[in-house]
């Protein structure tokens, strides 16, 4: 592919964005970022930063000027209200596509989610499986994919990536609960005990395949791809690796699924727990996708297993833990306020 290696990253100040911008800069790309939040200080003199909303055509145009391609990683989060989720994830995606096409960009990589499949007790889900998005977030992501497919052409390739839950340096959010409990010498309870296989993904592997989607032949990239780890065990065994690494001799513990689900659901509705129903239900079934298409067309060969990715993320957490002690929020880059879970932690 013949271009100047100038890429726009929407959502460049989020968890994926931080890792992707760093990955691209290390490999000689010119990077422009569009985000509501400023970039990390380490990037300030190395990128073109545009503070703005992906729903604003002028902001997207300013970021896309002179670029060859765009990675659309900006998205509303599942904890936000349904109207905001749809506006950002559907209307924002459409706006980015329209501007990118008008500005003459040749490649668009849309970061979707396996949430478009809904929650099914299934391994090796293929890209042609029926879409059954769970909740406002999953439904909006599925609708955004429909928008993306309408823009595909030989001159404007639109790759849709559906990553599993991805982790690594800078990731906190729901995984911050596990790391906090492990670092404090606590066991970790899982509804149902975690005796099912659950595929994750290291953010470094996701960054690698994004670049593959940017640089592969259009006839290969102009498709939809599942992205996940190739090596993973049960949720119990993979989470236990974090507790073992912490070195306190603690174990993953089983909570009865139905009572735990009822209590967590009530606590979330009352604003006393960050664990929303989709997370709970997703953690109680087998969940993995088939990555054969990405392997064959994009050369995707994940370097990290679930355990590798979890330990790598936990090591980063331990190095940076002090800076997060008084910060909470709803994004993936800060700890979530534990609410009642912080009190329950004392029991384990």
Label every model-predicted segment.
Residues 168, 190-196, 223-232, 243-246, ...:
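Glycine-rich Rossmann NAD(P)(H)-binding loop
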Residues 216-275, 291, 311-312, 324-326, ...:
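Mid/C-terminal beta-alpha module of Rossmann-like enzyme folds, strongest
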Residues 275-348:
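C-terminal amphipathic/interface module of NAD(P)-dependent oxidoreductases
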Residues 95, 143, 171-177, 192-214, ...:
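Substrate-positioning beta->alpha
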Residues 51-91, 99, 114-119:
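NAD(P)H-binding glycine-rich loop region in Rossmannoid oxidoreductase-like domains
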Residues 145-169:
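Conserved beta-loop-beta element that borders a ligand/cofactor-binding pocket
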Residues 95-137, 151, 159:
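Conserved Rossmann-fold NAD(P)-dependent oxidoreductase catalytic core, especially the SDR/UDP-sugar
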Residues 7-27:
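N-terminal Rossmann NAD(P)H-binding glycine-rich loop of SDR-like oxidoreductase domains
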């Amino acid at each position: 592919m013949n271009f100047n290696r100038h890429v726009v990253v929407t959502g460049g100040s989020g968890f994926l964005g931080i890792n992707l911008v760093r990955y691209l800069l290390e490999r000689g790309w010119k990077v422009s970022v569009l985000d509501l939040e400023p970039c990390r200080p380490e990037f300030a003199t190395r990128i073109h930063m545009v503070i703005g909303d992906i729903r604003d055509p002028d902001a997207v145009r300013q970021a896309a000027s002179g670029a060859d391609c765009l990675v659309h990683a900006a998205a509303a989060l599942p904890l936000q209200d349904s109207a905001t989720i749809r506006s950002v994830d559907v209307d924002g995606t459409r706006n980015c596509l329209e501007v990118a096409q008008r500005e003459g960009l040749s490649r668009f990589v849309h970061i979707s989610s396996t949430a478009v499949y809904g929650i099914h007790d299934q391994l090796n889900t293929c890209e042609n499986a029926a879409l059954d998005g769970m909740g406002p977030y999953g439904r909006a992501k599925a609708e955004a994919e429909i928008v993306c497919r309408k823009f595909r052409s030989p001159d404007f390739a639109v790759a849709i990536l559906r990553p599993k839950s991805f982790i690594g340096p800078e990731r906190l959010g729901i995984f911050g609960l596990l790391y906090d409990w492990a670092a404090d010498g606590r066991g970790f309870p899982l509804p149902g005990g975690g005796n099912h296989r659950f595929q994750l993904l290291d953010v470094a592997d996701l960054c690698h395949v994004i670049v593959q989607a940017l640089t592969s032949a259009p006839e290969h990239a102009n498709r939809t791809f599942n992205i996940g780890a190739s090596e993973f065990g049960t949720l119990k065994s993979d989470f236990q690796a974090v507790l073992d690494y912490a070195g306190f001799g603690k174990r993953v513990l089983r909570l009865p699924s139905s009572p735990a689900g009822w209590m967590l659901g009530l606590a979330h509705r009352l604003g006393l727990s960050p664990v929303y129903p989709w997370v709970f239900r997703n953690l109680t079934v087998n969940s993995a996708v088939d990555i054969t298409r990405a392997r064959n067309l994009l050369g995707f060969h994940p370097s990290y297993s679930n355990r590798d990715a979890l330990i790598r993320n936990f090591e980063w957490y331990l190095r940076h833990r002090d800076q997060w002690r008084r910060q909470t929020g709803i994004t993936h880059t800060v700890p979530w306020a534990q609410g009642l879970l912080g009190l329950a932690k004392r029991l384990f």
